[in-house]
Amino acid sequence: SPVAASYRATAGLAGKALDF
């Protein structure tokens, strides 16, 4: 998910949790 990729770049683990 492109949105999740942005979260991973900034939040790391939070991005994985928000993988939608």
Curated annotation (Swiss-Prot):
Keywords, in A-Z order: Acute phase, Calcium, Disulfide bond, Glycoprotein, Secreted
Modification comment: Glycosylated.
| Record localization | Secreted
According to its UniProt entry, the protein's GO biological process terms are: acute-phase response
Q: Which residues form the Pentraxin (PTX) domain?
A: 1-20
Q: Main role? A: Displays several functions associated with host defense: it promotes agglutination, bacterial capsular swelling, phagocytosis, and complement fixation through its calcium-dependent binding to phosphorylcholine.
Similarity field:
Belongs to the pentraxin family.
State how it assembles: Homodimer; disulfide-linked. It is not known if it assembles into a pentraxin (or pentaxin) structure. Pentraxins have a discoid arrangement of 5 non-covalently bound subunits.
Query: What protein name does the entry list?
Result: C-reactive protein
